[in-house]
Amino acid sequence: EDKLDYTLFEKNVCGGEVFEEVSKDLNFQGRIIDDLEKKFGKNNEDVLFQKKFYTLVELEHLEFINILNDQCDLGMATILFFYSNEEKGIEQSEEVGRLLNTVYARNSDSLLIYSFDVNLDSNLISKLKLKYDISESPVIVVNEKIKIFNPQNLEEIEQTLEKSEDESDGSSIIYLN
């Protein structure tokens, strides 16, 4: 609803508390997913349904943050984290998740991280995987421009954040058009 106030009903998008207002629902929905996964398991049908809704909420939030960055010079960096809860990739995904938690803690005023389950049966996830050429996990996409397969340490992620506008140096980083 808050996002609609700014987009559809033409409320001043660059107003003081816009970021906080549009972020409240995202944070609330994320906590619900965490609680449901702990209570019922990551593969529970109701949990998976809620994750589909959360994917939509995340993408709407990302879209709005892009508007704030473009029109209001918000200066918020973004990381899209593509992970797997399947046995084959869960350990690597959880390790990258821990790294991202640390990166976020160090940069919480200027960074947003959006997490997407690559195995979720969702048209939105399929479209994201196609858009960012995601065929495995874990993968992060920094500022929707730079893709890193299975980042190994904090420095790799933080350096990529710092130089997200620079050209590739030949590592496991891929620059997207």
Predicted features and spans:
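Second-shell loop/turn segments in exported
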Residues: 38-47, 84-91, 145-147
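Sec-exported extracytoplasmic/periplasmic mature domains
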Residues: 62, 105-108, 162, 166
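Thiol-based oxidoreductase modules, predominantly thioredoxin-like and allied folds used
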Residues: 81-85, 108-123
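Loop/turn elements at helix/coil->beta-strand transitions in domains of secreted/extracellular proteins
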Residues: 76-77, 108-112, 136-137
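Coiled-coil termination/hinge junctions
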Residues: 73-82, 93-95, 120-121
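Non-catalytic, surface beta->alpha helical segment in thiol-disulfide oxidoreductase systems
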Residues: 3, 19, 136, 141-177
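Typically the conserved alpha-helix immediately C-terminal to a functionally engaged Cys/Sec
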Residues: 90-107
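Non-globular targeting/processing and membrane-anchoring segments
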Residues: 1-77, 166-177
